[in-house]
Structures are given as C-alpha cells and as structure tokens.
C-alpha cells in the first residue's frame, strides 16, 4: 500500500485551515496543521512533508518569509502560497512553486495539490542524485 502524501497546511484563519484539512484528509492525504510561521517551520523540520499550503498574510511572519526558510532547508518540497489578495508583490512569489487564491473551489484546489504532488514525486529521485538541485523555486 503506497504511503499517503503528507501536506502541511499553514493559516492563521482557523475556519479556512480546518476546511482545507478536512478536504485533503477526505482525498486520502495526511495533514499537519500550523497557525503561524514559527510553528510551521518546527513541523517542517521535524516531519517528512510532501507539500506545503502556506497562507501569505500571517502575524509575526508572512508566508514568503516562511517559504524562504523552508526552501533553504528542503528546496525540493513544493510550496503553494495561499491568499485572498490577488495583488501580492512579485517578490512574495520568489520562493514558492504556485499561487492559489483562497477563493478557488475545492475541486480546483485538489487539482493543484495533485499536480504539485506529482511534480514532487517526479523530481524526488533526481533531487537525490543532484543534492536537491533537480528543480528550482519560481
């Protein structure tokens, strides 16, 4: 039986966080949750993660800063930045692999998650050979 993908969901808005957690668990994923950047970095460092869904606007540490720290340690793990604000600065997208509007339908979110997980699985063997340089963040 294949291992369930592990997704780290990070959002300071609990309703959205719980909704995404339920959706992803129903689709067969194992979901870790964090309500802030420091907690997310701790979970990311201590658990194997296949994908990160990361809110941009959070107190203390915005998502782009969290993504930069994550990519410094594990550049091969895909990160999707979430926001209700479609007007993020281009610099906010530097360390992420995708941007997802919080207004996306659950079906579209699942398609994006599946695509990013497929990319992760595709590049994981290559990253093992190249020391994590098989692909780079956007």
PLM regions with names:
Residues 14-32:
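Two-component/phosphorelay signaling modules centered on CheY-like receiver
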Residues 120-138:
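CheY-like receiver
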Residues 33-51:
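Acidic, metal-coordinating helix/loop segments flanking the phosphotransfer/catalytic sites
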